[in-house]
Amino acid sequence: MIELHRVSKVYSVGPVKVPALSDVSLRINKGEFVVLTGASGAGKTTLLRLLYRDDLPSDGNVEVFGHDLGTLKHRDVAALRRSIGVVFQDAKLLPVRTVYENVAFVLRVLGTPKREITQRVFDALRVVGLSSRAQAYPAQLSQGEAQRASLARAIVRKPPLLLADEPTGNLDEAMEDEILGVLRDIWAGGTTVVLATHQAYLARALRRRTLTLQSGRLVKDEG
């Protein structure tokens, strides 16, 4: 499903070249739950951005769903992204829309029939345990509820791949456990999950395959 072949990424900051990833090769199979860990600045977010084609590698090849993202035509990028759910540390909910409207938004943009939207939104809210908060606004949600709403939005199109970038970074321990439980449920439903976190203990708690980045290099592949 995902393959990186000797991938490097270098950013230019004025005249200075800053390496973010260096010679990373890995494979993630369909149906895996993989934890990507490492300190802040290790390259986790850069790697995820390459996977949903928000950026391109400086060297090497990135393949997702069998497509080489470096040669993917512009018109095919949107189709790729529709097959990938993405969640960030900040829930990024639209403040003037209800939970239901936030989750439904992308389906409306795609012209999905109203009846199908209703079914898909409530299916997603049920998975994340937020059905009773469908008409609440973001300001009325706890941080954990807001992140669950963000997860519902990410899975409402039933993507085969979910990328989660530090989704528990702003949460307390109880809320963190809630989100990890939701991620397990999403994975159990057949979605491939890649979770990036700087919190190494989460990888141990999840007992899943763990990829460790250090200064842009893949230094461990365990589990």
Q: Which ranges hold each PLM region?
A:
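Conserved ABC ATPase signature
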Residues: Y137-L141, E145-Q147
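ABC ATPase NBD coupling module
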Residues: P15-V18, L69-G85, K114, I186-A188
